[in-house]
Amino acid sequence: RQMCIRDRLNIEEIKEKGDLPTTQEELRQRRERAETLVKKKSLLSSGASIVPIPALDFGVDLKLMRDIIEDVNKIYGLDHDQVNSLSDQVKERIMSAAAIQGSQFIGRKVSEALLKVVIKDVAKRAAAKQTKWFPFVGQAVSASISYYFMSKLGKDHINKCEKVINNL
């Protein structure tokens, strides 16, 4: 199923580590390529958070985080050790994973809070008709949060790779 979605989003498969960029133009091209990859995989992450299967989004997000980091490294022609020597990446991965896992919980809490406000402000009959929309609101919030954190993780990693290259 993921292959079908991956094909629809036209996500580039990065098979081999490239050479190090030697000019600013090559660096700019690598950034564009990496940012496109991060955007598409972030969309995939947000899509997984919409599916109402417990822990599915968490498993997909863990795989996507690993894939994004490995693919961005390959795009820039770097290996894991070169990038990790710059900062404490493991701590950031754990925090990102926790944030993404929490996105579904936050979405539910936002939905519950919205439901309480509507019930207080609108007659019970009207509120009862509107409650059917709240699961969708929670899923939309969850998807937005998941996209944001996955995108942030990818962009931060792109910046780290560029710092490493500029320091070489």
Predicted feature residues:
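N-terminal, intrinsically disordered, low-complexity segments
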Residues: 6-10
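Alpha-helical membrane association modules
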Residues: 11-168
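Short, small-residue-biased leader/transition segments that mark boundaries at the very start
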Residues: 1-5
